[in-house]
């Protein structure tokens, strides 16, 4: 309880039994990063609903896991059954080469001399795109997208910063 509000926090899947109007914040699992000079994983998608009537009913809560690394894998979706039409989409994977993962927020592209890859796209209303990798000898990977901003592009020797989160 905080300031008269009851807070239910789920770090794994379970059941929610509310009795009134609630504010919901649903976050999906983040994407995994790639190896070497690869890009960073994107943040899990974020859905916020500040005034949702829930009534007296059981809801199944699914908490998405983060994506594995080396190679990067997309994060898993999070949802509350019967409340929202869309799930919070898992974050996109960062890549060493090829296309960065799309997701709640996109993964960062890999840096390579043979052609850096673009960052992955984010899901509208949930997150932002990842940054591109840098084309240079030992070019660095891009930062993963965040819920509040796009990931930065990689530089000659340093990876791009991840996108900012939301307050």
Residue ranges: model-predicted function:
Residues 1-167:
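Glycine-biased low-complexity/repetitive sequence motifs
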């Amino acid at each position: 309880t905080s300031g008269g509000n009851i807070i239910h926090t789920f770090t794994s899947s379970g059941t929610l039994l509310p009795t009134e109007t609630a504010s919901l914040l649903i976050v999906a699992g983040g994407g995994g990063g790639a190896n070497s000079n690869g890009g960073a994983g994107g943040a899990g998608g974020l859905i916020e609903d500040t005034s949702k009537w829930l009534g007296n009913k059981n809801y199944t809560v699914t908490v998405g896991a983060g994506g594995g690394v080396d190679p990067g894998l997309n994060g898993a979706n999070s949802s509350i059954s019967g409340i929202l039409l869309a799930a919070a989409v898992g974050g996109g994977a960062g890549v060493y080469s090829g296309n960065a993962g799309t997701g709640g927020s996109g993964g960062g592209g890999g840096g390579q001399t043979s052609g850096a890859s673009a960052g992955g796209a984010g899901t509208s209303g949930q997150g932002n795109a990842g940054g591109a990798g840098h084309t240079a000898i030992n070019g660095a990977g891009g930062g993963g997208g965040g819920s509040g901003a796009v990931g930065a592009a990689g530089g000659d020797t340093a990876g791009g910063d991840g996108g900012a989160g939301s307050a």
